[in-house]
């Protein structure tokens, strides 16, 4: 079975006003990591597990598996997939949570992630391929970070400096055109775009 991963590229940044990890980000990091390793060591059949708790568009509607737009956020297709998403969550989420407060941050995170899941299930209607990963929510965080700290520098791959606003625009454009041209990708670009759109509306 082919899985669609919603993963983010590696990014580094500096200049945050508070380097401590707030409770919301910490909770999400712990939950995602614990669930990943529980699934890995459980010995369960991955195809069966992902088809029930990943986001399978056709099952959300035909089988009324309405929990999938939530549970897919906590599943990842491998350690690197998990590492990238959790790194971006930690790097960009902590400043947003310090700025907004934990409750508002978590509401936004889940609004983007769940909204992206619902959008993916609509636009991917008829698909039996499970979508897994937190990147719908993570892309929403990147948008919010770009709007909140537009001129802050980040380092792509730890080397190339770029202002956050240009990075976010670039990622959005890439995801959009990739969704238009890619028909056999393991990355769910629709989920990335939807996370940003929900974040913008929110």
How should each PLM-predicted stretch be described?
Residues 1-202:
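A detector for small-residue-rich transmembrane helices and their helix-helix packing motifs
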């Amino acid at each position: 079975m082919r899985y669609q991963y919603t993963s983010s590229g590696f990014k580094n940044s500096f200049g945050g006003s508070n380097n401590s990890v707030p409770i919301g980000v910490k909770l999400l990091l712990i939950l995602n990591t614990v669930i990943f390793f529980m699934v890995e060591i459980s010995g369960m059949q991955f195809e069966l597990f992902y088809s029930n708790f990943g986001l399978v568009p056709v099952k959300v509607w035909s089988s009324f598996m309405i929990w999938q737009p939530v549970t897919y956020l906590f599943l990842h297709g491998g350690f690197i997939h998990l590492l990238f998403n959790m790194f971006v969550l930690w790097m960009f989420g902590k400043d947003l949570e310090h700025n907004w407060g934990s409750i508002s941050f978590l509401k936004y995170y889940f609004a983007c992630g769940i909204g992206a899941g619902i959008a993916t299930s609509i636009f991917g209607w008829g698909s039996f391929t499970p979508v897994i990963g937190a990147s719908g929510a993570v892309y929403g965080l990147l948008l919010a970070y770009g709007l909140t700290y537009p001129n802050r520098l980040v380092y792509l791959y730890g080397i190339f400096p770029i202002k956050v606003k240009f990075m976010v625009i670039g990622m959005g454009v890439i995801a959009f055109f990739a969704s238009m041209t890619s028909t056999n990708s393991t990355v769910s670009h629709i989920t990335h775009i939807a996370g940003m759109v929900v974040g913008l509306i929110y």
